[in-house]
Amino acid sequence: TRRSSDLMLSDAIKGVYASVYFRDSKAYMQATSNVIDQEKMAVILQEVVGNQYGDRYYPSMSGVARSLNYYPIGDEKAEEGTVNLALGLGKYIVDGGMTLRFSPYHPHQILQTSEMEIALKETQTRFYVLDLRNAGHDFSMDDGFNLLKLHVKEAEKDGEIGRAHVRTPV
């Protein structure tokens, strides 16, 4: 129902703000010498677009853009930034997974695909999808309660990779 969806959203937002009091968050603050009173936080709600396969929902693609490129290659410049793209949810990128990385000013200059050996070793092999079996269950502070980490071969088997199709929002 609409009311239960609103409550789940409200609980999720409260959970994000409460996370600053978690042990890991406090340890991070201490390790980085950050002061909690000077920290800022925001919650961004984004529509997830992709396709459903049984009890799994495959987000089409995720990306993280950074304004600085700390490791420019060739004629790239630090101020041109970088983009990391991945199949599935952005958690894979944020968690440090192997993703496609490039400078938006040099989109055809991708080190990871320059040689077959590098491509096989340094490209994405896993990704996150939404596990719809937990849809509608009570909110959990565990950020993985409704996620599955799958091998890219699963997406290929389900038909998510290799053919064009219409995306539907979740």
Task: Annotate each predicted stretch with a short phrase.
Residues 1-4, 168-169:
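Short, small-residue-biased leader/transition segments that mark boundaries at the very start
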Residues 6-73:
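Extended, Lys/Arg-enriched charged tracts that mediate electrostatic binding to polyanionic substrates
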Residues 17, 25-28, 75-170:
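Conserved catalytic alpha/beta cores of large enzymes that bind or transform nucleotide phosphates
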